[in-house]
C-alpha cells in the first residue's frame, strides 16, 4: 500500500493522525486511574522525545487498522485486505507497528515474536527500505501503536456506556489487551 499509493492523485485530509490521538489522550486522561495516566504520559513523552531527534520518518497513505481480521488469506498467501475506513495519511511506521503488533504477537501474553517481526521487516524492506530514523524509532512506534488502540478501545467503551449501548450486537474489544501490550512494548525501550 505504501509504495502503490505513493503517486495516488486523490487527497484525504489527515484523519486520526498524531494530533487526533493527543486530543483523545487529553480527553480520556482525567477518566484514567493514576497508574494508567502515568503510563499514558510516559509513552507520549518518549514518543515526543524520540521523534524530535529522528525526524526522517516518511508519510503517505496507510491502512491504519491492518489487523488479522482485516485480511483474507488462502493458506499462507495474502489474497485481500479489508476495511479501508481508517485509510489515512500518516507515517508509514505506524502501519508497520500496527501490523507487527498484531501479526507478530503471541497472544494472550502480548509478547512480540522477534523471529516473525524480523521476517516481516526483512520482507517489507525488499519493497521499501526503512530510513535510519524509522529504524531508530521502531520500538516507540510499537508502543505508540498499542497506545492508540488502547485509547480507541477506551473511547469506544466510554461512548457505548454514555449512550447505553449493550448486548451481543455491540462489538467492544477489550482495552486491557492493548494496555498490556503497551506495557510489554515499553519494556524494550532503549531511550
Regions found by a protein language model. Name each.
Residues 44, 117-121, 176-179, 183:
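Hydrophobic core segments within long, regular secondary-structure runs in both alpha-
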Residues 1-37, 57-59, 89:
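A cross-family kinase active-site recognition segment
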Residues 48-94:
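Active-site acidic catalytic loop and adjacent metal/ATP-binding pocket
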Residues 130-142:
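All-alpha amphipathic helical-bundle segments outside canonical DNA-binding/catalytic cores
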Residues 27, 149-191:
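ATP/Mg2+ or Mg2+-diphosphate-binding catalytic cores
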Residues 17-20, 43, 141:
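Short acidic/histidine-centered micro-motifs embedded in hydrophobic/aromatic stretches
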Residues 40, 120, 137-138:
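A structural signal for short hydrophobic/aromatic patches embedded in well-ordered alpha helices
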Residues 93-129, 144-161:
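Active-site activation/catalytic loop segments of kinase-like enzymes and analogous catalytic loops
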Amino acid at each position: 500500500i505504501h509504495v502503490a499509493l505513493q503517486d495516488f492523485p486523490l487527497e484525504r485530509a489527515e484523519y486520526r493522525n498524531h494530533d487526533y490521538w493527543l486530543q483523545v489522550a487529553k480527553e480520556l486522561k482525567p477518566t484514567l486511574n493514576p497508574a494508567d495516566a502515568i503510563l499514558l504520559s510516559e509513552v507520549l513523552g518518549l514518543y515526543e522525545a524520540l521523534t524530535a531527534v529522528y525526524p526522517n520518518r516518511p508519510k503517505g497513505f496507510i491502512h491504519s487498522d491492518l489487523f488479522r481480521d482485516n485480511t483474507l488469506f488462502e493458506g499462507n498467501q495474502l489474497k485481500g485486505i479489508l476495511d479501508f475506513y481508517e485509510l489515512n495519511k500518516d507515517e508509514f511506521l505506524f502501519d508497520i507497528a500496527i501490523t507487527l503488533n498484531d501479526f507478530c504477537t503471541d497472544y494472550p501474553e502480548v509478547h512480540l515474536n522477534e523471529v516473525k517481526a524480523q521476517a516481516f521487516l526483512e520482507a517489507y524492506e525488499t519493497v521499501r527500505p526503512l530510513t535510519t530514523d524509522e529504524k531508530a524509532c521502531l520500538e516507540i512506534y510499537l508502543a505508540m501503536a498499542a497506545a492508540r488502540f488502547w485509547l480507541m478501545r477506551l473511547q469506544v467503551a466510554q461512548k457505548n456506556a454514555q449512550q447505553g449501548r449493550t448486548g451481543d450486537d455491540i462489538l467492544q474489544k477489550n482495552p486491557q489487551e492493548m494496555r498490556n501490550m503497551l506495557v510489554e512494548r515499553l519494556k524494550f525501550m532503549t531511550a
